[in-house]
Amino acid sequence: RCIRDSLRQALREVATSGELDSLLRYQPHRGRPQDRASIARHLRRRGITPDADQILIVNGAQHGLAVTVMAALNAGDVVAVDALTYPGFKVLAHAFHLDVEPIPTTADGPDLDAFEQLCATRPVRALYTMPTLHNPLGWVMSATDRTRLIEIARRHGPLIIEDAAYAYLVEDPPPPLAASAPDITVYVSGLSKSVATGLRVGFVVAPTSRVPSLERAIRATTWNTPALTTAIACRWIEDGTVDQLEAQKREDAKARQALARRELAGLPLIGHPSSYFTWVPLPDDARADRLTATLARQHISVSTAEPFTTSKRTPQALRLALGSTDLDSLQSTLRTVRRVAIEDGYA
């Protein structure tokens, strides 16, 4: 059953459920108790077991990150982030005047020696991290590295902000940081990536002591997430639609990643086997901006490293999004990318 059919069915069920009037009223800032209970059950399949009282429903994961920053940090606070990271967090850091400290990355995750050294020399208030399918590099931190990261955080005191937006794409990953360190971790995720981008339903799982300040931030920014969309999302959680859609997307992403590796043979690719994006590092003397401009003239949009970079030096690289078109069009597009790269001497 396609998502349009699922949506039609859910709308009919909501319309005849007898709760439509209540769904159109103001709701508790952190969401209705029954909806938070549904999300708690969903999160158990992600490897964490929060109480419903630890969950706050938000308008997507980006809103979840925003209210976390509002609730936990102040202007000038030092925040550790990967040297290449999600651009949406960079936007928040700039808007809230945070002091961003980049952590070098390895092939498998953040350089934990560098993170520990940073914590020893600067008053790091928070670490923003994507341990399960990093954007843009696609790595999944090992269980050993997760344990060490938590040990460093416990020694030095920073809050861990765990972004799990893409975690659904990884089968059987190590447990989230929030599973091992729920008292020092705020876990942020949502259904926009895994179900539908227009379904702006996200969730924050926080230590109980931080829930009131997060709730105030939700009140200040949106009052509450619309109960109508939350009700649809929770119906899909309960009837298995979310699990089905996530499984379909994992298989689709695997097919797209495999296609990219075939069509871009000769280019160095970095990415998870079930990721919807891949990273193409270029030589230091390359001009990624020139490549993107050439591709743009052929109606192909790719990104340089600049939006993802938090360090002073921007590496020469491209990020290719693989999920925005059908497979036939993607194949043609990838062939064009490879041809342009070859013409410029990069493959």
Protein language model regions, located:
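Conserved core of the PLP fold type I
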Residues: 2-6, 11-156, 167-186, 343-345
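Active-site PLP attachment segment
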Residues: 7, 179-213, 225-228
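Hydrophobic residues in beta-strands of the RecA-like P-loop NTPase core, especially within AAA+ ATPase
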Residues: 81, 161-162
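Short hydrophobic/aromatic beta-strand micro-patches
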Residues: 205, 279-281, 321-323
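Structural signature of PLP-dependent enzymes
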Residues: 214-219, 237-261, 285
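Conserved glycine-rich beta-strand-loop-beta hairpin in the small C-terminal domain of fold type I
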Residues: 250-261, 269-282, 291-294
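PLP-dependent enzyme catalytic core of the Aspartate aminotransferase-like
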Residues: 297, 311-347
